[in-house]
Design a protein with these regions (language model features):
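Active-site environment of divalent metal-dependent phosphoester hydrolases
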Residues: 2-6, 53-56, 86-90, 113-116, ...
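Mid-to-C-terminal alpha-helical segments outside catalytic/metal-binding sites
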Residues: 2-45, 97, 223-225, 235-271
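Non-membrane alpha-helical structural segments and their capping/turn regions in soluble enzymes
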Residues: 25-28, 61-64, 89, 93, ...
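Generic structural signal for well-ordered alpha-helices
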Residues: 31-38, 64-71, 96-97, 128, ...
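Conserved, mostly hydrophobic/aromatic
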Residues: 38, 67, 71, 99, ...
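Active-site gating/metal-coordination segments in enzymes
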Residues: 44-45, 53-150, 196, 200
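Short beta-strand segments
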Residues: 45-50, 83, 177-179, 203-205, ...
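Catalytic pocket-lining loop regions of alpha/beta-barrel enzymes
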Residues: 105-109, 120-228
Length: 271
């Protein structure tokens, strides 16, 4: 992500307790360095999450151009996620179209950092409706942050998973991904939505792998709609390798592990 855009308070939280911060900066500055890390870890492809939240985090719409350029280093391996925040661009729907043209594969909404409820289009926000409409037309999944955020100024009420219920209903051809599975307060809501809606998925990034079955004891039931992720280098996520190893040690079927680690992402983001 473009760390140079981050507000000092947000950047301080990203740095806190992270001994490898210099390495993180190096990976962000040079995609070849990051690809070398993926090779070392045995990771075939990675989704790089970016979004627009100028007031709380500092990310402006220019983050889309930054990540599109970054991922051009290896578009077969680096999956670009960009963002739209109505009011920061003249036409939110047109911005989604532009994102698709420059190689961005998915849209990320962060309700608690954007102070924007996922279903706000039902209350007159036509620009948000345009985001969903154009993403659906362009075949771009929309990832929506669910659950809490500890960043200064985050408005967590907007990130309740059930607010995404309307989105799944009103845009039935849109792939919706609930980021973080509602962690840590709303995981039952996320599980319910993934089971209810054909077009609803979730990722498990930002959740300690050893706690996954405590939070989602019936995770194997939805294994075909769960995406593995780490949320690295976010707060509380020290490394990628340990996350993978702990996930692989879970007492679930190998078939379920493969779906979560590989098959589901390969299906949603074909090369």
């Amino acid at each position: 992500m473009p760390y140079h855009m981050m507000k000092p308070s947000a950047l301080e939280l990203m740095k806190r307790g992270r001994k490898d911060y210099a390495d993180v900066e190096r990976y962000c500055a040079n995609p070849k360095e990051f690809l070398g890390l993926l090779d070392h870890l045995g990771v075939e492809r990675a989704g790089l999450i970016n979004y627009v939240a100028p007031k709380i985090i500092g990310f402006t719409p220019e983050a889309n151009d930054w990540i599109a350029k970054y991922c051009k280093a290896a578009p077969d391996r680096l999956i670009a996620f960009g963002g739209v925040l109505p009011g920061t661009v003249p036409d939110a729907g047109a911005e989604v179209d532009r994102m698709a043209r420059i190689g961005i594969r998915a849209v990320k909404l962060h309700p608690s950092h954007q102070v924007l409820s996922p279903n706000e289009y039902m209350h007159g926000n036509r620009e948000l409706a345009a985001v969903y409409e154009r993403a659906q037309t362009n075949g771009m999944p929309v990832m929506i942050h669910t659950g809490t955020s500890i960043f200064p100024g985050a408005r967590n009420l907007h990130a309740q998973p059930l607010l995404c219920d309307d989105v799944a209903i009103d845009y039935p051809e849109l792939v919706v991904i609930l980021a973080h599975g509602g962690r840590p307060l709303c995981m039952e809501e996320a599980f319910f939505l993934v089971r209810r809606h054909k077009n609803m998925h979730m990722d498990i990034s930002g959740i300690p792998p050893q706690k996954l079955l405590e939070y989602f004891p019936r995770m194997e039931e939805i294994a075909g709609k769960v995406l593995w992720g780490t949320d690295w280098p976010g707060p509380g996520v020290p490394e990628i390798k340990g996350n993978i190893e702990k996930f692989l040690s879970l007492p679930i079927r190998d078939e379920a592990k493969r779906k979560i680690l590989y098959d589901n992402a390969a299906r949603l983001f074909p090369r």
